[in-house]
């Protein structure tokens, strides 16, 4: 078994993402793969909406490293397949979306739903069951209001379920608000952040940089090398 990677926590604006968390609906502790801001250029200013942290189960490192010996951060960042493997890999993922600006649950869920349904219809994979899941997804969010500092939390299980939880104060609750059994939606939520057209390039950059270091460390340790890189000097500021 691969030991828990030694990672640092990260701060995005005023949001602190700890180095590991135990997500709602999970029995595992997951490590912080990367974190970054989500924003948009509005009238010449970059307006920041949310900070996003992506956590992964320990076994993600050997699985991702197997195909990517010696890849640079830039090569990982340019690789659609690398991020696709994070999205679809057989390990648990946890995505924390914390508000910098206020947002209503209705605004958030409608945007995510629209995007998912659009992609599924384009791929010809949209079904009645997906329609039912999307209705449930919209229902969970409809009365929620997210003030700055509050979070939307998604636990993506390799068995195909999506656990959704809300936090008003930065703590991670133990109980879930809802569990949806739909693998496509479970993957789509994380893909919307780090996929080919993901909304947070900063989170992708952070993941590529930190996972590159961790995969290098894993390769060296598996090759019996005693030279373990000092990750602190490469960590994202």
From Swiss-Prot:
<dbReference type="GO" id="GO:0009813">
    <property type="term" value="P:flavonoid biosynthetic process"/>
</dbReference>
<comment type="similarity">
    <text>Belongs to the chalcone isomerase family.</text>
</comment>
<dbReference type="InterPro" id="IPR016089">
    <property type="entry name" value="Chalcone_isomerase_bundle_sf"/>
</dbReference>
<dbReference type="InterPro" id="IPR044164">
    <property type="entry name" value="CFI"/>
</dbReference>
<feature type="binding site">
    <location>
        <position position="192"/>
    </location>
    <ligand>
        <name>substrate</name>
    </ligand>
</feature>
<dbReference type="Pfam" id="PF02431">
    <property type="entry name" value="Chalcone"/>
</dbReference>
<feature type="binding site">
    <location>
        <position position="50"/>
    </location>
    <ligand>
        <name>substrate</name>
    </ligand>
</feature>
<dbReference type="InterPro" id="IPR016087">
    <property type="entry name" value="Chalcone_isomerase"/>
</dbReference>
<comment type="function">
    <text>Catalyzes the intramolecular cyclization of bicyclic chalcones into tricyclic (S)-flavanones. Responsible for the isomerization of 4,2',4',6'-tetrahydroxychalcone (also termed chalcone) into naringenin.</text>
</comment>
<feature type="site" description="Important for catalytic activity">
    <location>
        <position position="108"/>
    </location>
</feature>
<dbReference type="InterPro" id="IPR016088">
    <property type="entry name" value="Chalcone_isomerase_3-sand"/>
</dbReference>
<comment type="pathway">
    <text>Secondary metabolite biosynthesis; flavonoid biosynthesis.</text>
</comment>
<dbReference type="GO" id="GO:0045430">
    <property type="term" value="F:chalcone isomerase activity"/>
</dbReference>
<keyword id="KW-0413">Isomerase</keyword>
<dbReference type="InterPro" id="IPR036298">
    <property type="entry name" value="Chalcone_isomerase_sf"/>
</dbReference>
<keyword id="KW-0284">Flavonoid biosynthesis</keyword>
<protein>
    <recommendedName>
        <fullName>Chalcone--flavanone isomerase</fullName>
        <ecNumber>5.5.1.6</ecNumber>
    </recommendedName>
</protein>
